[in-house]
Amino acid sequence: MLNISLCVDGVWYDAINDLYCIPKKFNVGIAEPKTNYVQVPYRNGSLDMSEALTGITYKNREIAIPLLILHPEPLAVYDLVSNRFNGKKCKIRLFESLESQSEYYYEGRIRVGTLLTNDSKWEFDIFMNAFPFKMRDVLIYVDGATTKSITNEGIDTVPTITVETAMQGTWNGESFTLAVGIHNPHSMVLKTGANTLVVAQGAGKVEFAEKRL
């Protein structure tokens, strides 16, 4: 049995237990690469400039999920879902079964579709215009001298480092010093794969959203 959970304004709602709906199937589109082909006079074919500036970039992906209402008052359920989610920026997690768990989520704007009846069953679709990547939030605390191996299974990203006590150490072998405060140091890129944070002194936390197709 499939299930989903939706997050709006920082609160997660389980489709079955909180919204009285069950997903019939998942329709998750792939993120289409953005391309840029330039026609050059007197040259065979086109010049592919798709990766010239920032590497490969992607368009948003489309997600559509038909929901079957389980509650004896389907109109009330439809009103509940519409008022809580329609038009709002949300996160959504997809579960292959009631027992499965997933830290990954998609994020985008939700649109609630038309309520339909079919053989005494009430159902509607929800649609999301989603950011290209599915994401997973990672939070790592450091306090005093320590070494942390941080694995990033997604694309390269810059972490947010909240420093509570002035911090010194190395990031992938490069020295750094950070004062108390919130930092997004572009010299401390979280590369795809294994990364090593060595803290000689200080305390704080490292946060990032792992992004993968």
Predicted regions and their residues:
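Extracellular/virion structural assembly segments
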Residues: 1-213
